From Swiss-Prot:
The gene is CYP719A2. This is (S)-stylopine synthase 1. Its main location: endoplasmic reticulum. It comes from Eschscholzia californica (California poppy). One of its GO terms (molecular function) is monooxygenase activity. Heme binds at residue 439.
Length: 495
């Protein structure tokens, strides 16, 4: 929402359009289809902007978390004067939406601009549930991301990790010990996804570099989509038209990048083979592939970067993690930790869970939409109603997580799922959402994140670039939870 405020202040067209459409917006407000649905209470609205005056100043998920303390864990927020959304910040109601009535709330409500880079909303994350969505999701999970296929990637992931460690060492030597690890992690994940899409023999560094740039460019222009959705007539403004042109340029870049590979004869265990076998249009195939990169690369790499930032800020946690990794590596004669080792490392798993709790990569998930008339808390919900679950709020519930704003992996070391509090912690930790629309790439994401963090924490001691200059933990919301200031760190080789 901070992007919206900046755009409004710097763009007189938006203010002009707001004034000229006041009467039309009021007309739309009072002539909406009548319904017996009663919207949950929420903060008082202003004409045209709804609650947007309350949503700036800090991260949106934090603002909504604080508003929920005043207006209730199920409240209505108006993004502009015509786009109400129910925001859920309570685990019981979140499970009602995400799990117990998963099929009722399984539709999507996406900004129009996203049609351009999703083949008209025909990708897994953008399409409503139905036969197409089910088939596409099963193909990704049962073919490209099958356990057998992921296991076949282990040797390649380990080679990529060895290369990454060497590259980081070289960067540190040339830069007084300081590195910027994020791009290195992104490219390792890009290579992994490329092999799952095209086959194990795929090795094209130019493609990896170009895809990396395409993702970065799309993330850069993504913020405007929320503004256009808030103001109905913003889509007619020059600034919005400029954003559309930029997304269309990104669309062409992706098409030109992926389309030459559609004529390959890929192995049967690849995502490309599955997509072609379903006789999908080339446009659907291209953007189903792009979606795997868009949602997989930054989410995994940024979560690893957040974890490293926490380890720098909490040296005792970093040392405790290193001791576990070093002990295991010594006993098992490891130069690098292997993918199959990851689940045997208890403290590593606790650090991973705590990182995902503190910095969920999609803190507001992707908004759900009721695909039929249903209910919430026993009250009627109309078909088409938008519902957003604030994952951040669930993860920072002080009644579930003691001292919730403190990074404390130990909280996950002795969780008893039979204990009431342990069960509440398990149910409240939803970094990948839950229910039928849970992240399709969850297992791959957890695997790559865990593997990367284990080896980077084992290979190097991570510290501040200068004494007292701690990593900036402020974030900004795009497709995923971005670092406002990308991580820089000083590294020293441990082994």
């Amino acid at each position: 929402m901070e992007e919206m405020k900046i755009l409004m202040m710097n763009n007189p067209w938006i203010l002009t359009a707001t004034a000229t459409t006041l009467l039309i917006s009021i007309f739309l407000f009072f002539t909406r289809k009548s319904s017996k649905m009663v919207w949950p209470a929420g903060p008082k609205t202003l004409p045209i902007i709804g609650n947007m005056h309350l949503l700036g100043g800090t991260a949106l998920q934090v603002v909504l978390h604080n508003l929920a303390k005043v207006h209730g864990s199920v409240m209505t927020i108006w993004i502009g004067s015509w786009r109400p959304v129910i925001v859920v910040s309570d685990i019981e109601r979140a499970w009602e939406v995400l799990v117990n009535k998963s099929s009722d709330y399984s539709a999507r409500d996406m900004p129009d601009i996203t049609k351009i880079i999703s083949a008209d909303w025909k990708t897994i994350s953008t399409s409503d549930s139905g036969p197409h969505w089910t088939n596409l999701r099963k193909g990704l999970q049962n073919v490209a991301l099958s356990p057998h296929n992921l296991a076949a990637q282990f040797q390649f992931q380990e080679k990529d990790m060895t290369k990454m460690i060497q590259t980081l060492e070289e960067e540190a030597r040339n830069n007084n010990g300081i590195v910027k690890p994020l791009d290195h992690m992104k490219k390792a994940t890009l290579r992994l996804i490329s092999r799952l899409v095209f086959g194990q023999d795929f090795n094209n560094d130019k493609y990896v570099d170009d895809m990396h740039l395409a993702i970065e460019e799309l993330i850069r222009v993504s913020g405007y989509a929320r503004l256009a959705e808030a103001f109905y007539y913003a889509k007619y403004l020059p600034s919005h038209k400029k954003a559309v042109r930029e997304v269309e340029e990104a669309q062409r870049r992706v098409q030109n990048l992926v389309s030459p590979f559609l004529s390959l004869n890929p192995p049967t265990n690849t995502y490309l083979h599955f997509l072609r076998s379903q006789k999908y249009d080339d446009e659907v195939i291209i953007f189903a592939i792009f979606e795997a990169y868009l949602l997989g690369v930054d989410s995994t790499s940024l979560t690893t970067a957040w974890a490293l930032a926490f380890l720098i800020r909490e040296p005792n946690v970093q040392e405790k993690l290193y001791q576990e990794l070093e002990s295991f590596a010594s006993k098992n004669d490891r130069r690098i930790l292997k993918v199959e080792d990851i689940n045997k490392l208890q403290y590593l798993q606790a650090v991973i869970k705590e990182t995902m709790r503190m910095k969920p990569i999609a803190p507001l998930a992707i908004p759900h939409k009721a695909c039929r008339d249903t209910s919430l808390m026993g009250k009627k919900i109309d078909k088409g109603t938008r519902v957003m679950v604030n994952i951040f709020a669930l993860h920072h519930n002080k009644n579930v997580f003691n001292d919730p704003f403190k990074f404390m992996p130990e909280r996950f070391m002795k969780v008893d799922s039979q204990d009431a509090n342990g069960k509440a912690m398990e149910q409240s930790l939803l970094p990948f959402s839950a229910g039928m629309r849970i992240c399709a790439g969850m297992e791959l994401g957890k695997l790559q994140f865990s593997f990367a963090l284990a080896n980077l924490a084992y290979a190097f001691k991570w510290s501040c670039v200068a004494d007292g200059v701690l990593p900036d933990m402020s974030d900004q919301l795009g497709f995923v939870l971005l670092m406002k200031t990308p991580l820089e760190a000083r590294i020293n080789r441990r082994n």
